[in-house]
Amino acid sequence: MLAAGMQPAEAKTEDGKWLIYLSLSYSGNSWQSEAANIVKALAKTPPYNDTVELVEVISGTDPQSQISDYESMIANGADGIVSFPISSNALNRTVRHGCEQGVLFFMYDATVTEQCAYNVSYITSGFGENTAQALVNELGGEGKIFLSRGVPGNSVDERHTNGAMHIFNQYPGIEIAAEYYSNWDDRTTQQETSKALAAHPDVDGIWAQAGEYGAIQALLQADENRLVPMTGENSNGFRLALANEEYQAKGLSGVSAGSPPAQSGLAFKLMMEMLEGERDELPEDQRNIQYPLPWVTADDVKLCEGDTFEDGCNTFPGDKVPSSFVTEVFNPELLPELSLASALEGTPTPGATIQPLPADVIENAPNEPGINCRNCDAPENLYELTTVEPTVSP
């Protein structure tokens, strides 16, 4: 039974299924594969396996290519598009056109500033500033550091770096010796970090986005007995390294935070609940939805014995998943349908059925000009620390 005021939309395929597009831009790393697999697994989970036709489209890193693909999806009668957008601004006109045609746009992780789209993202939860402060704390406020960034021009990379620089600029003793784009990929991060180490072998710390395990490999390749404090994202290899006593003795310390692939699953389920009339659509000025920031120190690393996050575990044994596997694929409260095979292969969990999201699942994200809104004012406490406290004064 539908709640009062909720009316289901009408599916557009000939067989009565919802036509849903999974639109990727950059797709060259484990995170992107896992996020896409989560959506695929959910779409194959009853009852969606009988009601959803899911079509995956990979556009690449050229905004014009994703614009063209969006236009084709709209023309083909899409009911919904769940997407990792390549640009926060370049896609806006096409997104608005799609909204006017009745298409629901749900962006995950990366964001757009067209307010008719839903942005489901941890981007505003403070990764950049909190991890930067954690690194400053580890270094005692002084030292040479590298910045290992993501994909040029993407809103996620820009927001992370802006937040980090807000902190680093407060500490005159912090010197940014090298800054490079690593495309959120272990191999590229290792290559770019190795280049930076050739020029600055005395680096004291590394602030990294996804691909951080590659930075550890570059450090060990340069000097097998020397590691440095690092902050990074959620790769399984990085979490295992943080908890490795041998690596700690060589100098490794830090925190694992960053982007959960599970954001894609929340975006997909929210979109489906709205299409099915189980949840009201939100006013356009309330469509920025915040996903919480994971935060795991060496002391917090706990190995999982099974194929899901249970009993507070957050990392898998090294012989179970690749080092590049992004751990934050599960959310037992929001995505109980998923298992390890869902993230690795896009397959549904045997016996699982789609469970409704909690009624109060939506947490409004703050507006950030150029990131998730246009013609809006940023909050005064935009880069306020929310997870870590300074232990050294600027």
Q: Language-model segments: what does each one mean?
A:
Residues I20-N29, S33-A41, E129-E179, M271-T308:
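An alpha-beta-alpha
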Residues S88-G126, K144, G237-A241:
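Flexible loop/hinge segments that line or gate small-molecule binding clefts
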Residues L2-K17, F268-P394:
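Hinge/cleft segment of the Venus flytrap/periplasmic-binding protein
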Residues G5-M6, Q66, V120-I145, R159, ...:
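Hydrophobic alpha-helical segments within soluble ligand-binding/sensing domains
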Residues E71, A75, D79-E100, A164, ...:
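Hydrophobic alpha-helical
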Residues I58, V112-N137, L147-P152, E179, ...:
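Short beta-strand elements at the ligand-binding edges of bilobed clamshell
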